[in-house]
Amino acid sequence: MKTDIEIAQSIELKPIVDVVEKLGISYDDLELYGKYKAKLSFDKIRAVESNPVGKLILVTAINPTPAGEGKSTLTIGLADALNKIGKKTMIAIREPSLGPVMGIKGGAAGGGYAQVLPMEDINLHFTGDMHAITTANNALSALIDNHLHQGNELGIDQRRILWKRVVDLNDRALRHVTVGLGGPLNGIPREDGFDITVASEIMAILCLATDIEDLKRRLANIVIGYRYDRTPVSVGDLQVEGALALILKDAIKPNLVQTIYGTPAFVHGGPFANIAHGCNSVLATTTALHLADYTVTEAGFGADLGAEKFLDIKTPNLPTSPDAVVIVATLRALKMNGGVAKDALTEENVEAVRAGFANLKRHVENIRKFGIPAVVAINEFVSDTEAEIAALKELCALIDVPVELASVWADGVEGGVELAETVVKTIAENPANYKRLYDNDLSVQEKIEKIVTEIYRGSKVNFEKKAQTQIAQVVQNGWDKLPICMAKTQYSFSDNPNALGAPENFEITIRELVPKLGAGFIVALTGDVMTMPGLPKRPAALNMDVESDGTVLGLF
């Protein structure tokens, strides 16, 4: 089997103008970035707003192994297969962060014969959106420090500045830094730090904004810190939301590319799901819904994180809710959740599959709580055995959830046809009746407790003293009616990454609350979730190179 990049480089791409023609998009509607990438103009986005709204399919997963379970691959393969069976389909997914690409992932544009192309560009600098977000974020940092240096008219307490700088890399050395050193000419010394770009609130804002005016409104609402009297300071107080929106004026437009089989795809925005809401842009998803009969999108990590946030935070900003949720499961992840060590996941172990099924079952139950039908997709690996597959299908039948084997990684579009047919049938026979998990009018504590007890199945929430103080501050400032965005490990329902499977009777500790008023939610931090990742012992970057003719090597 060829590597992902070898497969990608063997495909003859169509000009993006030709790919999107079937959607009613013309050359004049596009802002081209070479022959194979483009942004869609705002004029076209506005023109299609009166079109009917298509069906929405959300792809999520069980709690993953560190390598991931092929959610993006299944999303792409399912969309290709839907087109294959005659359904006019688009994809709306996130764009990769360069840090994890150079770190552990090595690429994040699908895999095998289910990829979005040109994968080298998508995984590297693409259309420059990440750089625009990084620049806007750091421009705000520079403007804050300049305000301090020039007399601090707003009375900002430099000890209570929340806003951090960002870079689109995994760089643990930058987590805690001191800026403003070197004497009076170099500013006011203060503690600072760097997050990875996809953890920036500006990324979340870009993915939730509906147009330039909404973007400016959200940017103005960002809380950058507090004054000496403990009152909040916003970007609007600094009067720089216009400048930040100017930096982002092109980044807000959705990017268009294609799959190996010519399915049009929006690849736009990419907040992490363990520290932000983990979904691609509202603008891309909404536009896809107006252009196609079926839109396939995804939410980061497992359904306890990405899907819950998609349904509680993103869906209220969309013209429709998901008609079906596809839960991606792999036998290796089920075995890991069933107690098998990482180095033994390729060995047949039917009992571990049965034990790990408790994890999948809980995710299915959770999706049904939102009133949406679920379909299980088994992402096939070469190490899977017939006995393991049969056991999983038998267990799915016991809870009356449709299940299909998908081999889109190895077999491309043909490997997803049965899944596509099952999803279409499920949507036709089981109309969704979407309902949110909680009402925003509940208190902050009640909303967090609802997520912990209903989705994670924990028994209790503990609030550290710092979090209790911050809840009082949130209430005092009138922010308590915002939804909650949980920051939690992706590997477990609990806040302990080692508690795999379907743990019960556990307690979750909230250590900190961070207001993200621009994004429109409150982040509740649990455990040791990092907003700036580090590199592994052997980064994927060690295998990367470029030849003299520009051919990229080592992405996978």
Swiss-Prot record:
Question: Has the keyword Nucleotide-binding been applied to this entry?
Answer: yes
Q: Name one Pfam family in it.
A: FTHFS
- Known catalytic reactions: (6S)-5,6,7,8-tetrahydrofolate + formate + ATP = (6R)-10-formyltetrahydrofolate + ADP + phosphate
A biological process (GO) of this protein is:
tetrahydrofolate interconversion
User: Annotated pathway, please?
Assistant: One-carbon metabolism; tetrahydrofolate interconversion
Instruction: Kindly state which keywords UniProt assigns to this record, in alphabetical order.
Output: ATP-binding, Ligase, Nucleotide-binding, One-carbon metabolism
Disulfide bond annotation, renumbered to this chain: none
Identify which top EC class this enzyme belongs to: ligase
Q: Name one GO molecular function term.
A: formate-tetrahydrofolate ligase activity
Matching Gene3D superfamilies: Domain 2, N(10)-formyltetrahydrofolate synthetase, Formyltetrahydrofolate synthetase, domain 3, P-loop containing nucleotide triphosphate hydrolases
- Documented EC number(s): 6.3.4.3
Q: Which residues bind ATP?
A: T65, P66, A67, G68, E69, G70, K71, S72
By sequence similarity, the record places it as follows: Belongs to the formate--tetrahydrofolate ligase family.
**What is this protein's record name?**
Formate--tetrahydrofolate ligase
Give the organism the record lists: Streptococcus pneumoniae serotype 19F (strain G54)
Q: Which gene encodes it?
A: fhs
